[in-house]
Amino acid sequence: MCIRDRFIFFQIILGAFLAGLDGGLIYNTWPDMNGKFLPDDVSIASFFSSESFNTPSIIQFIHRKMAYILFILILYLNIVYIYKKLPIINILLFDLAVLFQIFLGVITLLSGAKIFYASLHQIGSIIVVSSFLYICYKNINTNLQPSN
């Protein structure tokens, strides 16, 4: 498992924590968090507290920033695909799934976590993982696979 894989699964776990803590009901602005980079009720020290995974604003902050990091990693993956002259169709499904997931995440947030959008966003995570597994399968014989 390479770092990109870990980021995807960590992002899904953060989303599960966020849903469980009803974190989508707070800070319903985007791209900032009520006009600020860091939420009002969070300090840098609180990130290192034992309660950090019970604080919805911290989870939402990390979930948002992880999404940006994942987007950059996926852009890099696309560049590698083009550079190695691999069939772009293999990664197109993954790209579309990720873009749709980002769109759903923003819509879910701006809607105040309406159940329809929140459910679609959770289903979208399954589609992202499935499409990622598909490109891993399609590239099993290339050097894009991480070494153990």
Residue ranges, per PLM feature:
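Short, small-residue-biased leader/transition segments that mark boundaries at the very start
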Residues: 1-3
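A juxtamembrane structural motif centered on a specific transmembrane helix
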Residues: 130-148
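Aromatic-anchored segments of alpha-helical transmembrane domains
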Residues: 8-13, 97-106
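Interfacial helix-loop-helix junctions of multi-pass membrane proteins
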Residues: 18-28, 102-126
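Juxtamembrane loop-transmembrane helix junctions in multi-pass integral membrane proteins
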Residues: 51-61, 85-89, 109-119
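Membrane-interfacial catalytic/cofactor-binding modules of polytopic membrane enzymes
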Residues: 12-70, 75, 79
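Membrane-interface helix-loop-helix junctions at transmembrane boundaries of multi-pass membrane enzymes
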Residues: 78-94
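Membrane-embedded alpha-helical segments of multi-pass membrane proteins
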Residues: 65-70, 120-128
